[in-house]
């Protein structure tokens, strides 16, 4: 039986080189990243797992809640680029944006907690005449 999956909300998050596309679906509370469960994809890293669950915890939403409540959302994520920490932070921003699209009342709580603020720090470009972004070749006085 193929059931049509209805996307309830979408969100895109970026951090460093990582880009995460997040979709919220009605379901059983699964968190899938690139086809794998979140714990498996993030290699059981507690910092990354806490980061991606933080927007849900802020709203007191539990993935394993009752079947008849609003809290049974499947979160499907496609993420590419960057490292594991950058990807986790991109997912966190994408989830927060998707939750805001899903229910506008969540926006104030997420905004006050800083989940909707994108971290704008990226790698600085290399300049000509220098070895790296700021590292200059050794200076010879004579």
Curated annotation (Swiss-Prot):
Tell me where it mainly resides.
Answer: plastid
Q: Which Gene3D superfamilies match?
A: 3.30.230.10
Q: Which InterPro entries does this entry report, sorted A to Z?
A: Ribosomal_Su5_D2-typ_SF (IPR020568), Ribosomal_uS9 (IPR000754), Ribosomal_uS9_bac/plastid (IPR023035), Ribosomal_uS9_CS (IPR020574), Ribsml_uS5_D2-typ_fold_subgr (IPR014721)
This protein's UniProt keywords? Chloroplast, Plastid, Ribonucleoprotein, Ribosomal protein
Q: Which GO terms describe its cellular component?
A: chloroplast; small ribosomal subunit
Q: Would the keyword Cell membrane turn up in this protein's UniProt record?
A: no
Q: Does the keyword Manganese apply?
A: no
Q: Which GO terms describe its biological process?
A: translation
Q: Which GO terms describe its molecular function?
A: RNA binding; structural constituent of ribosome
Entry-linked SUPFAM superfamilies:
Ribosomal protein S5 domain 2-like (SSF54211)
Compartments it resides in: Plastid, Chloroplast
The cross-references to HAMAP family, in alphabetical order and at most eight, read: Ribosomal_uS9_B
Q: Which family does it belong to?
A: Belongs to the universal ribosomal protein uS9 family.
Under which name does UniProt file this protein?
Small ribosomal subunit protein uS9c
Instruction: Supply the source organism for this entry.
Output: Stigeoclonium helveticum (Green alga)
